[in-house]
């Protein structure tokens, strides 16, 4: 490098030596101001090869401060923009034209927002329970029972219409598919995983998984969903297996002391998961159902009154009643009488609870003991631990009875009219006793004198054309007395008699006949050629030696087989039976 002093004058260096700043500065400033975009591009390529040009650029930057303040370009659009990285890194400086501003898209939002949506103030996708499961009436079943665990019904289920637990996805219109998972957790916080399992349709490993398309059907009902319980020695293994499968919606973990697990009550936890537009898995907040209680446990089962032996009682209380119900705990049950703002509890002890299904108690007194009309109240069972009540039954309180001994009733009856009975025509009641006498034998055949199906008394009298005397038939004697033998009794000759009715009997079969005559006795045995009417040949009045009796052949009044046509030998006189 050559030294140049003030006396050197016109001498000019001839080698490629770095010019001084005083010599190079005046011509450098106007040349750089007149540079255009093509010249700057060529200049950026020669920076690394010429140290003189680097010094010129450095001086220009120091004077104008170009690019050091980070300000935006001025009105001269298209001028080069220099970015300073420090004095030690000037070799890496590049020059180029400023890129034009990007044109906004026609839909009004940057393209990057379609790839990664930022969370906005709008509603987020979430899950709700539209039909809660029925809390009571469901029985948990063991796996060893070898049968279906039943189906959990909806809270609004009745005997006439059945409903099912249901969920709904909301604000999920932009999602293509959502997976809903249901599992069992504790009733209370922190809602750890329960050892019991869900079994039924779409259930594996104790949980239920369904896939939904919100744009098609955002609602879903869980059909044939049952609860399967485990034994106490299997609690720990069941919980560990579920945690290994990732079933822990509240991240509560397991509990070493599993004695705190309530085996008679569970909650169903519903949780939905989906993939966003970037393919990342996202989960919605878990939702818990109402507690579901085991039916077979008396501590949590449904209370029900089957029958009460009385439906009314005095308002003073103390009436003993018998109540039949489902199984209850004798130390955890109460019978309550309630109406509006009044409530009373029945009086009974644990010894009055019979085999958990019957309670003997005494009614409490009503709040107003001076009621004048019956008052109806409700009676129901109530469990003391959780306050659960049964369906009520009506009970009526009756007004107080001021005449407990019935004195007023006896006074209202009055005294008997003794004087009136003594002054009557029958003071001793003889006539009334006669009316109550037992009927005789003939009263069954001749109940009255009127017309009817019975024969009149005159039919039993003998015909005077054939009988010169009185004929007496045993048991058929005409009743004596003024009622039948007086002159006022009218005889009807057209009425059928006993003898004319005998002609209407069917013919007797052929058999031997014996005829006894008054002149002599002769036996004639022969065949009867045909039916002959019954005639009265002869008649011998009963003598003193005879018994005065006549026999009826056959049974009852009319003969089944009568002898020959002779009247005296067949009907009125005793004789041997035909053989």
Curated annotation (Swiss-Prot):
UniProt free text on domains: Both N- and C-terminal domains are required for transcriptional activation.
Induction data: Up-regulated by mitogens and NUPR1.
Protein name as catalogued: Transcription factor RelB
GO MF annotation list: DNA-binding transcription factor activity, RNA polymerase II-specific; identical protein binding; protein kinase binding; RNA polymerase II cis-regulatory region sequence-specific DNA binding
Pfam families in UniProt: RelB_leu_zip (PF16180), RelB_transactiv (PF16181), RHD_dimer (PF16179), RHD_DNA_bind (PF00554)
Taxonomy, superkingdom: Eukaryota
Main location as per UniProt: nucleus
Keyword ATP-binding set for record: no
PROSITE patterns, per the entry: REL_1, REL_2
Region described as Leucine-zipper: spans on this chain: 40-68
Role: NF-kappa-B is a pleiotropic transcription factor which is present in almost all cell types and is involved in many biological processed such as inflammation, immunity, differentiation, cell growth, tumorigenesis and apoptosis. NF-kappa-B is a homo- or heterodimeric complex formed by the Rel-like domain-containing proteins RELA/p65, RELB, NFKB1/p105, NFKB1/p50, REL and NFKB2/p52. The dimers bind at kappa-B sites in the DNA of their target genes and the individual dimers have distinct preferences for different kappa-B sites that they can bind with distinguishable affinity and specificity.
Post-translational modification as stated in the protein's UniProt record: Phosphorylation at 'Thr-103' and 'Ser-573' is followed by proteasomal degradation.
Lineage: Eukaryota, Metazoa, Chordata, Craniata, Vertebrata
Subunit structure, as described in the record: Component of the NF-kappa-B RelB-p50 complex. Component of the NF-kappa-B RelB-p52 complex. Self-associates; the interaction seems to be transient and may prevent degradation allowing for heterodimer formation with p50 or p52. Interacts with NFKB1/p50, NFKB2/p52 and NFKB2/p100. Interacts with NFKBID. Interacts with BMAL1 and the interaction is enhanced in the presence of CLOCK.
Organism of provenance: Homo sapiens (Human)
Keyword terms, alphabetized: Activator, Biological rhythms, Cytoplasm, Cytoskeleton, Disease variant, DNA-binding, Methylation, Nucleus, Phosphoprotein, Repressor, Transcription, Transcription regulation
């Amino acid at each position: 490098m050559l030294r140049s002093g003030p006396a050197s004058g016109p001498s000019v260096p001839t080698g490629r030596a770095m010019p001084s700043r005083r010599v190079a500065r005046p011509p450098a400033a106007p040349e750089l101001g007149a540079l255009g975009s093509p010249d700057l591009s060529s200049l950026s390529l020669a920076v690394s090869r010429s140290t003189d040009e680097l010094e010129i650029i450095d001086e220009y930057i120091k004077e104008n401060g170009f690019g050091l303040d980070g300000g935006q370009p001025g009105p001269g659009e298209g001028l080069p923009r220099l970015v300073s990285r420090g004095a030690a890194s000037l070799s890496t400086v590049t020059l180029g034209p400023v890129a034009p501003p990007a044109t906004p898209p026609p839909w009004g939002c940057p393209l990057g927002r379609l790839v990664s949506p930022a969370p906005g103030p709008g509603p987020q996708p979430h899950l709700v329970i539209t039909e809660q499961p029925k809390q009571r009436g469901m029985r948990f079943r063991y796996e060893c029972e070898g049968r279906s665990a039943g189906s959990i019904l909806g809270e609004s289920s009745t005997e006439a219409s059945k409903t099912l637990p249901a969920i709904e996805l909301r604000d999920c219109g932009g999602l293509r598919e959502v997976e809903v998972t249901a599992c069992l957790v504790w009733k209370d916080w922190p809602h750890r995983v329960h050892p019991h399992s869900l079994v039924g349709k779409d259930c594996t490993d104790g949980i239920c998984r369904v896939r939904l398309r919100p744009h098609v059907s955002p609602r879903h009902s869980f059909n044939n969903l049952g609860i399967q319980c485990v034994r106490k020695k299997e609690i720990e293994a069941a919980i560990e297996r579920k945690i290994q499968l990732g079933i822990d919606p509240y991240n509560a973990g397991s509990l070493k002391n599993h004695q705190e697990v309530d085996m008679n009550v569970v909650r169903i936890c519903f949780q939905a998961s989906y993939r966003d537009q970037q393919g990342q898995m996202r989960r919605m907040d878990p939702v818990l159902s109402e507690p579901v209680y085991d039916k077979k446990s008396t501590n949590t089962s449904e209370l029900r009154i089957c029958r009460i032996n009385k439906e009314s009682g005095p308002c003073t209380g103390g009436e003993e009643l018998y109540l039949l119900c489902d199984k209850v705990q004798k130390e955890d049950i109460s019978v309550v009488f309630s109406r509006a703002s009044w409530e009373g509890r029945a009086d009974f002890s644990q010894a009055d609870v019979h085999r958990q299904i019957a309670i003997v108690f005494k009614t409490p007194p009503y709040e107003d003991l001076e009621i004048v009309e019956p008052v109806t109240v409700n009676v129901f069972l109530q469990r003391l631990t959780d306050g659960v009540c049964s369906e009520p039954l009506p009970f009526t309180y009756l007004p107080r009875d001021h005449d407990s001994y019935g004195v007023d009733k006896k006074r209202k009856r009055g005294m008997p009219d003794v004087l009136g009975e003594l002054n009557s025509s029958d003071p001793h009641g003889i006539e009334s006793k006669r009316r109550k006498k037992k009927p005789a034998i003939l009263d069954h055949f001749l109940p009255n004198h009127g017309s009817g199906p019975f024969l009149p008394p005159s039919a039993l009298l003998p015909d005077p054309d054939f009988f010169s005397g009185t004929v007496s038939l045993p048991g058929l004697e005409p009743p004596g007395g003024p009622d039948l033998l007086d002159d006022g009794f009218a005889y009807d000759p057209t009425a059928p008699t006993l003898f004319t009715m005998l002609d209407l009997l069917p013919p007797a079969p052929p058999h031997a006949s014996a005829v006894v005559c008054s002149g002599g006795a002769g036996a004639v045995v022969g065949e009867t050629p045909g039916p002959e009417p019954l005639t009265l040949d002869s008649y011998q009045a009963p003598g003193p030696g005879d018994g005065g009796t006549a026999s009826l052949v056959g049974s009852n009044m009319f003969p089944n087989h009568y002898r020959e046509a002779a009247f005296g030998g067949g009907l009125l006189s005793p004789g041997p039976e035909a053989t």
